[in-house]
């Protein structure tokens, strides 16, 4: 297929617009796509990228298109619809083998995208899930996989941020990340594209990326402006009207919405909060209008959210009550639109849902105004704005007043995309801009001494979008302190809930649980401040808090847990399930991982130096399994029967269970074989980067070496110890394959200390030097970690 027009039409059944062809065929990628709503920005990006990657062998190397497309949406409600659309395109083009498709909205079921760094992938997700991973603090996933996804998302990736006017302060984070990749360097090209119908280029100005005038912008071309279909869409008229709205008299509003609904069409009613939308939906249903009432917001479990979205797309005679989640990514049209007053960029998006296809001659938009007089008379003094602020939530009064002034200039009458005034919009962003110091600190994934992680919510969410993910399980009769038997939730189980609601439950002594990554269980949350955005929290199904209307703090009905498959996490610091499998010696397994890493590298075409780092790190990664503390976990009689010297892998029944293990002579709680691997590499003269990569390949020991709570302590109190290793431990000689045999080695833990003692440099100083090295840096280092981890997992699991 050598023509993008045919390629596009085969996927969509439509001819591409000229701006879409320009994106696909130009060598250079734009920085910004600024095209009116409803004209196919999503098709432009997805199909344009597919076309470029499909024909990559025909392009010059300096036109390289990143192999991962990261498509970020501001709200999870939209992810499924875009995912389904892209899946359909890939099937129509018969590209399922060449392009892998994933979605990230919480839960672990789609997290295996990081197994294949050499393959073409499209990853669709919400900005909080994607940006948290790009900042090395991935929401809703194993903390031990943070570094892999940090490395992969910041390398060889084309980031696309859709509807950036809805992103809040996260816009600045995306710009800073783009600047950091230039500052620290990456192994493969990574690019960012920002998209919106209402983009103000000044939104993309930050302290580390000040040259906004250098941004290349893709707009409608002259050919597009003469296109009859585009002209009809941009001129499609809507009759603009105003109506008073009182939350104390919802029945009046509900009655008017029903009255204005025209049979055989959709009516949208968009409200600014979940509570208002839910209350109006209930009020309309109570009046039994005789046609479907569909509620759309962000606080449903996946099955209910999908069901509602499917009804939205298929019901042609319905009232759809929604929050602002419908502003972006939903390709659907209505005849009648009710909307609360909102910031102007939001109103433009909402207006774009009305008469979207120019199919109505009598389309109408009704502005619902709850506080018209207060907004109109509000002064601009900070004190006045603060006092009025609560009534305007989740927005600010100044934004609503600005919209009101614009609307007053339009008056009541007909409006269209073409006639809406172009206003240079500002984003109200809190003063939380991530800086170089912050991203360097986030590279270290070790918790602080209190067991807490850095709260990155101010960098990845809209300022009013502070939510956690909750799920329900039947846990009656189990301990309310620690629960070991419940696995991590699948994405189907998760529901978004406000942080404020969950903190209130903790204050009321309602038992809730959070994941304990040290010991692997779920522990009771005792302090409200432990509840931070992005956390995953378990609730007893007996407590309630969920109904047909989604997350519902007032509901006490038992919640039916979602049937789920067990999710494989990366275990706790104590566990090492990846070592279960067919019998394999350290020599054989090391050879397999090096071979697999070589196969991956053959597709990535990195520099020879980088390949050497990765292959050496792979060779040394399991050297520490020769340590007696690791070998003590496997039954001696099983080892003898198998005839394997120093096994790296053993079948499940060959391992001692936890109760048996604690009685074994060389057992060490929290033992980490990969730290032993790194120490062996250093003690045997390997470069620091090889030691680091060997140590970091499970994501559990990286920049810091710190002993664990309840760790076994040597009898000699003067001995240094950490992660099950004691100063002076002797590791027997071990064959690593590839002609590399490590002699018997006495481990030296002096590098735990500042200055490093007899080793010359501490572990922290070695790691810090690596990520400050301009030839390596934080993104390359994590990328190397990820490749070794992928090779190890694929070799261990027999995956191609």
How should each PLM-predicted stretch be described?
Residues 1-34:
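Conserved pre-motif I regulatory segment
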Residues 29, 42-64:
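Walker A/P-loop NTP-binding motif
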Residues 64-89, 128-129, 274:
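Conserved Walker A/P-loop ATP-binding site and its immediately adjacent core
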Residues 90-144:
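Inter-Walker segment of RecA-like/P-loop motor cores
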Residues 128-132, 137-187:
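SF2 helicase catalytic motif II
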Residues 189-191, 195-261:
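Interdomain hinge/linker at the junction between the two RecA-like core domains of SF2 helicases
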Residues 255-256, 262, 279-289, 295-310, ...:
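C-terminal helicase lobe and adjacent C-terminal extensions/tails of nucleic-acid helicase motors
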Residues 379-403, 605-798:
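Divalent metal-dependent catalytic cores for phosphoryl transfer on phosphate-bearing substrates
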